[in-house]
Amino acid sequence: MALNLRKNHPLLKIVNDSLIDLPTPSNISTWWNFGSLLGICLVTQIVTGLLLATHYTADTSLAFNSVAHMCRNVQFGWLIRNLHANGASFFFICIYLHIGRGLYYGSYLNKETWNVGVILLLTLMATAFVGYVLPWGQMSFWGATVITNLFSAIPYIGQTLVEWAWGGFSVDNPTLTRFFALHFLLPFVIAGLTLVHLTFLHETGSNNPLGIPSDCDKIPFHPYYTIKDILGFALMLTSLVALALFSPNLLGDPENFTPANPLATPPHIKPEWYFLFAYAILRSIPNKLGGVLALAASILVLFLMPLLHTSKQRSMTFRPLSQILFWVLVANLLVLTWIGSQPVEQPFIIIGQLASLSYFTIILVLFPIAGVLENKLLKL
């Protein structure tokens, strides 16, 4: 009998075991679609980014004009740029929903997969930050100045570190050049980490909405979940193209239509929408080092999730107290996102401080307490 090439060829075998014959729980919902959507986001960003890089010039005197030239004179350059800029927003929407799914259904108990995932989030945030600087508009320049300056809060080595990162005494040409190099490199680091993420995931298999082992009821990934994923791709890409064509600047900052000017500070310096929650936490502490530590903690706290799990059930499906806390946390993050976009004045300051405090309280204190309480109520 002839060998099945799909199952025996050294390379095709890897594809087969990951995308075709992969045993998958039969009951995973649409919340499990976001992993593959993130893969599509990454591919889209790398392709559009590569096309943009062929026309971009990483020099302070030319960067802004090279982006304008791209949008005016390059065939479909405007579309490629709009897809790339808005693709970043979709990337973050998908990753936040993906993390939310992981928190709700207890996926973080696959510790290796979860930890690599958090590292992926940090890498994505770094990539988006350095990418935002490249068009060299006002918000690009001042965003880079403000955020890189935060490292000067590190005791003793801070200022040296910042000047080393800048390549001078302010954000200037060397900074732009190295940020372009980093922005080109990091997506490939993300692609590599994604393979590690999947390798760890396929060691244990996917979790499912019930949070119970599903070994007794697995189905092949293809055709069941390939067709389900394709529906997700179609919906996401349609939304992305619609946004890029009809309202490409909806999520951007108008300040970035003005070329970078070190002598004029914009009235409100703020990052893109997907960083606003962390920016609000940073600003809620009236101390530079404290703010930086809170900013770091707001993301790094995800590493603690497996350690804070006190419930004897994996998923929140049958845990109403934890569910209430989860949705309060979601609402809290939306409040933080709104506060991050507002000026530093009352009542926004106090709202931001309360929202920041409740963010950490819910994750570090209330979730573990709710888990213990539910165990007692259910006599587990």
UniProtKB/Swiss-Prot annotation:
Co-factor requirement: heme b
Subcellular location per the Swiss-Prot or TrEMBL entry: Mitochondrion inner membrane
Chain residues that bind heme b b566: H98, H197
Binding annotation for heme b b562: H84, H183
GO molecular function: metal ion binding; ubiquinol-cytochrome-c reductase activity
Gene3D superfamilies recorded: Cytochrome Bc1 Complex, Chain C
Pfam families: Cytochrom_B_C, Cytochrome_B
Subunit details: The cytochrome bc1 complex contains 11 subunits: 3 respiratory subunits (MT-CYB, CYC1 and UQCRFS1), 2 core proteins (UQCRC1 and UQCRC2) and 6 low-molecular weight proteins (UQCRH/QCR6, UQCRB/QCR7, UQCRQ/QCR8, UQCR10/QCR9, UQCR11/QCR10 and a cleavage product of UQCRFS1). This cytochrome bc1 complex then forms a dimer.
Keywords for the protein's UniProt record, in alphabetical order: Electron transport, Heme, Iron, Membrane, Metal-binding, Mitochondrion, Mitochondrion inner membrane, Respiratory chain, Transmembrane, Transmembrane helix, Transport, Ubiquinone
Predominant localisation class: mitochondrion
Keyword Cell inner membrane: no
Record: residues binding a ubiquinone: H202
Protein name (Swiss-Prot/TrEMBL): Cytochrome b
GO cellular component: mitochondrial inner membrane; respiratory chain complex III
Species whose genome carries this gene: Vireo flavifrons
Transmembrane stretches, start-end: 34-54, 78-99, 114-134, 179-199, 227-247, 289-309, 321-341, 348-368
Family (UniProt): Belongs to the cytochrome b family.
More details: Heme 1 (or BL or b562) is low-potential and absorbs at about 562 nm, and heme 2 (or BH or b566) is high-potential and absorbs at about 566 nm.
Cofactor: how and how many bound: Binds 2 heme b groups non-covalently.
Topology within the bilayer: Multi-pass membrane protein
Function: Component of the ubiquinol-cytochrome c reductase complex (complex III or cytochrome b-c1 complex) that is part of the mitochondrial respiratory chain. The b-c1 complex mediates electron transfer from ubiquinol to cytochrome c. Contributes to the generation of a proton gradient across the mitochondrial membrane that is then used for ATP synthesis.
Amino-acid biosynthesis listed as a keyword: no
